[in-house]
């Protein structure tokens, strides 16, 4: 039986055997995999995402972040057939249904990658035109949107384990925020494989994309005002 792993702190973690939860094929009820997040230091994982992943993303321009997303899309798409089969087993869907999820994930990542290219080589997104704030143009201001210094925590639903992770991660990464994604345990087999293909392709900096398979435990206790 496959043991599903979390990916945090630049490493894979299989959890503690005594706390495993079983995943079953919804059609046959056969066990597919076991999962646990017990033993993971979530405080350290969050700090690592902020300091390593966040710093790496903020150093990149919008266009460069877009290139990361396109690379993620291609990495996942290369395993499309495998992921479709996995989706049918893990989610109990038809092949046609599974295509919505897998192709939705790669299509969304690619689209946000293209948006990054359109935004160009800057690091700040201007918010409207500038305004003269005094009698002369010497006192002038303009709002700009910059990356937050925290991490984006995504708790996802069971029905789109690939697309759900991808559409949230794409927006956050383009905005310069590292991601820790937590798929629904019942269908996290698909998400784990998606993340695994990205890690194997080595297409994003360490700390940018994290995965929790299993319980979030005390994760929320370690968040602060810059996290979302």
Provide a role label for each language-model segment.
Residues 1-134:
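N-terminal Rossmann-like NAD(P)+-binding subdomain of aldehyde/semialdehyde dehydrogenases
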Residues 120-228:
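Rossmann-like NAD(P) dinucleotide-binding subdomain of oxidoreductase/dehydrogenase enzymes
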């Amino acid at each position: 039986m496959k043991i599903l792993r979390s990916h945090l702190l630049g490493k894979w973690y299989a959890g503690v055997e005594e706390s495993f939860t079983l995943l079953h094929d919804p059609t046959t009820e056969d066990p597919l995999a076991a999962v646990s997040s017990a033993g993971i230091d979530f405080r350290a994982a969050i700090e690592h995402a902020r300091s390593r992943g966040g710093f790496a993303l903020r150093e990149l321009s919008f266009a460069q972040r877009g290139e990361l997303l396109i690379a993620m899309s291609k990495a996942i798409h290369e395993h499309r057939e495998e992921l479709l089969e996995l989706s049918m087993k893990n989610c109990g869907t038809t092949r046609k249904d599974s295509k919505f999820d897998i192709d939705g994930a790669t299509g969304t990542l690619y689209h946000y990658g293209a948006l990054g290219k359109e935004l160009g080589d800057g690091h700040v997104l201007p918010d409207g035109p500038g305004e003269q704030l005094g009698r002369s143009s010497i006192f002038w201001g303009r709002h700009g949107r910059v990356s937050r210094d925290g991490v984006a925590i995504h708790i996802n639903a069971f029905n789109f384990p690939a697309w759900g992770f991808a559409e949230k991660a794409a927006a956050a990464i383009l905005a310069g925020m590292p991601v820790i994604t937590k798929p629904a345990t019942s269908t996290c087999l698909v998400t784990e494989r998606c993340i695994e293909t990205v890690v194997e392709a080595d297409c994003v900096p360490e700390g940018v994309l994290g995965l929790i398979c299993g319980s979030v435990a005390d994760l929320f206790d370690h968040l602060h005002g810059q996290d979302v």
